Swiss-Prot record:
Localization terms from the record: Cytoplasm
GO terms for biological process, alphabetical: cell division; chromosome separation; DNA replication
Gene: scpB
InterPro entries: ScpB_csome_segregation, WH-like_DNA-bd_sf, WH_DNA-bd_sf
Name of this chain's protein: Segregation and condensation protein B
The organism's place on the tree of life at top rank: Bacteria
Keywords, alphabetical: Cell cycle, Cell division, Chromosome partition, Cytoplasm
Pfam families in the record: SMC_ScpB (PF04079)
Length: 199
């Protein structure tokens, strides 16, 4: 694995929050000048490759992967599925985690699920079921996510207080995140369905 590959991997997992040079230095042990040089090289590589949809954006010493403007129409069609289309298993899983644990960051969601959740979160944001509620006051200023009014309407809830009570202890086992998350999601879906049938 090359040094640039390591930086590219960090950019990917950092998602929309991005990553600072200091954070890359901490994760890799590379010197800051070398990191800046490799970020420039990677950005140039993306820009020069007509078959790559990626680019690197930098703001206030924070770097993040983004997609080139040319692919925007395709991404728009992918993300803006009509609300009449049922949510995927991954979307329901992320939505349930946000609903019960909000506000929380993408990294916290990733830790609970055991997989990268960036694209799923963005799809939920574009469908207006999830929104940015603030940012943590720590390096990188990670985005905090919460549910929207449309989320309540979508699931037929009057407020977050109407969410069915479930055992959140299943989410506390960091060593086995996926099975516990599955149980959590199943409880979320089953109890919502049961409450609808009782109405």
């Amino acid at each position: 694995m090359t040094n640039i590959e390591q930086i590219e991997g960090l950019l990917f997992v950092a998602g929309d929050e991005g990553i600072t040079v200091a954070e890359i230095e901490h994760a890799t042990g590379f010197a800051k000048p070398a990191i800046t040089t490799m970020l420039t090289q990677l950005a140039t590589k993306y820009q020069a490759d007509p078959d790559s949809a990626l680019m690197i954006l930098s703001t206030a010493n924070t770097y993040r992967l983004a997609t080139k403007a040319a692919v925007a129409p395709v991404l728009k069609r992918y993300f803006e599925a009509p609300l009449t289309t049922s949510l995927s298993q991954a979307s329901l899983e992320v939505l349930a985690i946000i609903a019960y644990r909000q506000p929380l960051t993408r990294i916290e969601i990733d830790e609970i699920r055991g997989v990268h959740s960036g694209s799923t979160i963005q799809k939920l944001v574009l469908r207006q079921l999830v929104t940015e509620t603030g940012r943590l006051s720590e390096p990188g200023r990670p985005i905090l996510y919460g549910t929207t009014e449309l989320f309540l309407d979508y699931f037929g809830l009057k407020s977050l207080d109407d969410l069915p009570a479930i055992d959140l202890a299943a989410l506390s086992d960091a060593e086995h995140p996926a099975p516990e998350t599955d149980l959590f999601l199943n409880a979320f879906q089953d109890k919502l369905q049961a409450e609808r049938e009782d109405e």
